[in-house]
A protein has these predicted regions:
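PEST-like low-complexity, intrinsically disordered acidic/proline/serine-rich tracts
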Residues: 2-290
Length: 290
């Protein structure tokens, strides 16, 4: 048998194996038999989860680009490319809101530091260590942990130890607006549905300047697709910013390393010089105050 014929047979065998693989494992296929369950029969969402996406840089499709201050940051500050998580490709901005988004991108590294605690008209809130809000907390490059109960579900995010309390029974109204909003949950079969309102209007969705106001309303759907991964979907509406509701979706994966746990990421000390030097309130820790 010639070498060329052997190579052809090997290639055909490889194609057959690949075809069998893709025929049996379809992306998004619901494998409910493998879903872990709690004592009351609900899907067991307990554990540490993390997204594998570049959405924190930009939730829309984007190419790799240099980041802010490339003369200092080089490749460290570069933006990786990504296919985006917005269904349909583009966010349906109103014209004036799209212009604000463009200004946000232009000014993402600007910090207008003042003594007025009610002002947040500056760059990306992540740059200044503010809480990320929803849905951004779910796709930042940090893990988060879910503690599931019948009446409440607790979500703790490694980034700044941000917390969400999902009220399943009974539902409660938000007492005040906040960075992470107010979450009420219910079960639709095996899907956890979380209705989120009560935002303070200061959060961004990513480093590209995509944003919403305090009229933001989000409906999340957390659906198990197997033993160790979920499909996350969120319908987003804000009549101040968008012409219609729109959706994002991406998978979440359970972290399975031995002794996996959330570690501390307290970013406040990392931004003290950035935030307080313009006010004359910062003294480096290795230099005595004057």
């Amino acid at each position: 048998m010639s070498i060329r014929r052997k190579a052809l047979i090997a290639a055909m065998a490889l194609v057959a194996v690949a075809a069998l693989w893709f025929a049996t494992i379809v992306p998004g296929q619901n494998s409910t038999a493998a879903v872990q369950r709690t004592n009351d029969g609900k899907p067991n969402l307990n554990g540490i989860w993390q997204a594998v996406t570049t959405a924190n840089w930009d939730i829309e499709a984007h190419q790799a680009e240099p980041g802010p201050r490339p003369e200092i940051m080089g490749a460290w500050g570069a933006q990786p490319g990504g296919l985006g998580i917005v269904e349909g490709g583009a966010i349906p901005y109103k014209p004036e809101a799209l212009e604000r988004k463009r200004q946000n991108l232009k000014n993402r590294m600007v910090t207008k530091v003042t003594n007025d605690p009610s002002r947040f008209d500056s760059g990306d809130p992540e740059l200044q260590c503010y809480r990320p809000g929803v849905p951004r907390a779910n796709y930042m490059p940090f893990p988060f942990q879910i503690f599931q109960g019948r009446e409440q579900i607790l979500m703790i995010y490694e980034y700044k130890a941000s917390i969400r309390q999902v009220y399943v029974d009974p539902h409660l109204e938000a007492p005040v607006d906040s960075w992470m909003g107010w979450s009420n949950g219910s079960w639709d079969g095996d899907t956890l549905v979380v209705d989120v309102k009560g935002f303070n209007g200061h959060t961004w969705f990513d480093r590209a300047g995509n944003f919403a106001t305090d009229a933001l309303h989000i409906v999340e759907r957390w659906t198990p697709r197997g033993r160790d991964h979920l499909m996350y979907e969120a319908t987003i509406e804000d009549p101040n910013v968008y012409t219609r509701p729109w959706k994002i979706s991406f998978p979440l994966y359970r972290r399975l390393e031995p002794n996996v746990q959330l570690l501390e990421f307290n970013c406040v000390p990392f931004v003290e010089e950035l935030m307080y030097t313009p006010l004359g309130l910062y003294n480096p820790p290795d230099r005595p105050s004057r």
